[in-house]
């Protein structure tokens, strides 16, 4: 079904809005993928906060033109699914995990702001921890010394209480 001019403008505006907030875009060829598998991919993308759509390449070229992702225009050839995310790693992870499970699904390219990645670059990006994982590790690292200090401070009154209990037990036994 072809789109009329107003519908095309609406799609370009919607994709432009997503691209403006994006930290990563991943392109993948979906030729030969069954509908049920694509539905699972869409559900996984939604859960990870990834905007995932099959769009006409010309419309996406217009949406990314003049942005930090304009270098991707040369890679927009063939039937592609576009994964756009605010987390630099989320789109790469979702699409790469799906590509591992489905041989017909092929990662073509990706981009971070100002940098175009090939398929290997997207795969290596997918192995990085997500922003939430990195923040959790940082928080754990920051809390560890404080928690150890609190345990050390708590040990002094605990030892004193144990000493008093031992003296009390000795006096009661005698």
Swiss-Prot record:
Q: Which UniProt keywords apply?
A: Ribonucleoprotein, Ribosomal protein, RNA-binding, rRNA-binding
What's the short name of a Pfam family annotated to this entry? Answer: Ribosomal_L10
Q: Which GO terms describe its cellular component?
A: ribonucleoprotein complex; ribosome
A GO molecular-function term, please?
A: large ribosomal subunit rRNA binding
- Glycoprotein found in the keyword field: no
Keyword Phosphoprotein attached? no
Set out the biological process GO terms recorded for this chain's protein.
Answer: translation
Record text on subunit structure and interactions:
Part of the ribosomal stalk of the 50S ribosomal subunit. The N-terminus interacts with L11 and the large rRNA to form the base of the stalk. The C-terminus forms an elongated spine to which L12 dimers bind in a sequential fashion forming a multimeric L10(L12)X complex.
| Family statement | Belongs to the universal ribosomal protein uL10 family.
Q: Which PANTHER family match?
A: 39S RIBOSOMAL PROTEIN L10, MITOCHONDRIAL (PTHR11560)
Q: What does this protein do?
A: Forms part of the ribosomal stalk, playing a central role in the interaction of the ribosome with GTP-bound translation factors.
* Name of protein: Large ribosomal subunit protein uL10
The organism is Methylobacillus flagellatus (strain ATCC 51484 / DSM 6875 / VKM B-1610 / KT)
């Amino acid at each position: 079904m072809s789109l009329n001019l107003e519908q095309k403008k609406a799609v370009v505006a919607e994709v432009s809005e997503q691209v403006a907030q994006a930290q990563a875009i991943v392109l993948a060829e979906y030729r030969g993928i069954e509908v049920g598998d694509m539905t699972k991919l869409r559900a996984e993308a939604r859960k990870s906060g990834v905007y995932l759509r099959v769009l006409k390449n010309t419309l996406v070229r217009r949406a990314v033109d003049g942005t930090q992702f304009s270098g991707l225009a040369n890679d927009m050839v063939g039937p592609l699914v576009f994964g756009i995310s605010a987390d630099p790693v989320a789109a790469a992870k979702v699409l790469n995990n799906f590509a591992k499970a489905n041989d017909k699904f092929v990662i073509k390219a990706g981009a971070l702001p100002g940098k175009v990645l090939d398929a290997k670059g997207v795969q290596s990006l997918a192995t990085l921890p997500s922003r939430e994982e990195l923040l959790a590790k940082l928080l754990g690292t920051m809390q560890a010394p404080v928690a150890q200090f609190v345990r050390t401070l708590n040990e002094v009154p605990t030892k004193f209480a144990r000493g008093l209990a031992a003296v009390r037990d000795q006096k009661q036994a005698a």
